[in-house]
């Protein structure tokens, strides 16, 4: 949607099978949370806005086997996990006043409270709340129902096609960018 409206877009994509067709989209493919962190850090300085919509793993295995782990006599296998770097928090910590940072939250309980907490912790300008509690919304549907939360409050949107939801989000982003430009 951003590219369709004329923006130059850098898409940092994990291992997905989606094609990127628009000439205004430069795609950077990554395979790990560490690679996504590095690419995000490298691109953010020159960006007017960043939309963080990827569900990046919060943890990674402490050790990675280079061969198949065979089943022995043990019925259990213990994996030790390490936290990955928090991409959103790191960008929020270096965000300039002339940049926007947009996050997403998928919540199933305490939706408002959890989204507001994430908004503050990550220094987002606004956060898009997705709920799995609404019929026809979320994964496996062509529709979604969102709320946009900022420090002033919450705007709820009705169930719409995902293309319409994208337009709503970019409308809000565009309005915020115009406001930044007028006040700088």
What is each stretch, according to the model?
Residues 31-105, 109-133:
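Glycine-rich phosphate-binding loop
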């Amino acid at each position: 949607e951003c590219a369709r409206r004329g923006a130059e877009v850098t898409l940092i994509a994990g291992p997905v099978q989606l094609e990127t067709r628009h000439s205004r989209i430069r795609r950077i493919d990554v395979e790990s949370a560490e690679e996504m962190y590095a690419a995000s850090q490298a691109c953010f300085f020159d960006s007017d806005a960043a939309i963080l919509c990827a569900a990046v793993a919060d943890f990674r295995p402490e050790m990675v086997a280079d061969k198949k782990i065979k089943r022995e006599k043990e019925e259990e296998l213990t994996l030790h996990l390490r936290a990955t770097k928090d991409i959103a928090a790191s960008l929020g910590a270096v965000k300039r006043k002339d940049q926007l940072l947009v996050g997403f939250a998928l919540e199933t309980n305490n939706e408002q409270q959890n989204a507001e907490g994430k908004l503050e912790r990550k220094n987002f300008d606004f956060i898009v709340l997705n709920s799995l509690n609404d019929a026809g919304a979320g994964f496996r549907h062509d529709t979604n129902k969102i709320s946009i939360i900022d420090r002033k409050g919450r705007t709820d949107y009705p169930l719409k096609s995902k293309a319409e939801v994208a337009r709503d989000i970019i409308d809000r982003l565009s309005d915020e960018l115009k406001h930044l430009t007028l006040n700088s």
